[in-house]
């Protein structure tokens, strides 16, 4: 059985979030939380919140044992981009793309043996 949590339209660039999400894929939940707490990136607290939500979903909805949970899937997709303009010299303007992310984490119980 798998439990899933998704954070949609989070204001962090997907490229930056993927750096952090790659660190926790395949790890046990307790180890993943420890890694996120000690990773000095802006995406770390956001991903930790999604991971805790996935664990809570597993415990509440599917009666899974929290100590046996493993991060089976963790990925970041691109969300909608907010387009902004930065004024430049000579009356020109440059485009600024404020990128957003959809963060998905799936946890499941580790098989015995």
Curated annotation (Swiss-Prot):
It holds the Pfam family Ribosomal_L22. InterPro entries: Ribosomal_uL22, Ribosomal_uL22_bac/chlpt-type, Ribosomal_uL22_bac/org-type, Ribosomal_uL22_CS, Ribosomal_uL22_sf. GO terms for biological process: translation. One of its GO terms (cellular component) is cytosolic large ribosomal subunit. Keywords: Ribonucleoprotein, Ribosomal protein, RNA-binding, rRNA-binding. It comes from the Bacteria. SUPFAM superfamilies: Ribosomal protein L22. PROSITE patterns: RIBOSOMAL_L22. The keyword Zinc does not apply. HAMAP family: Ribosomal_uL22_B (MF_01331_B). This protein binds specifically to 23S rRNA; its binding is stimulated by other ribosomal proteins, e.g. L4, L17, and L20. It is important during the early stages of 50S assembly. It makes multiple contacts with different domains of the 23S rRNA in the assembled 50S subunit and ribosome. Part of the 50S ribosomal subunit. Belongs to the universal ribosomal protein uL22 family. This is Large ribosomal subunit protein uL22. It comes from Anoxybacillus flavithermus (strain DSM 21510 / WK1). The gene is rplV.
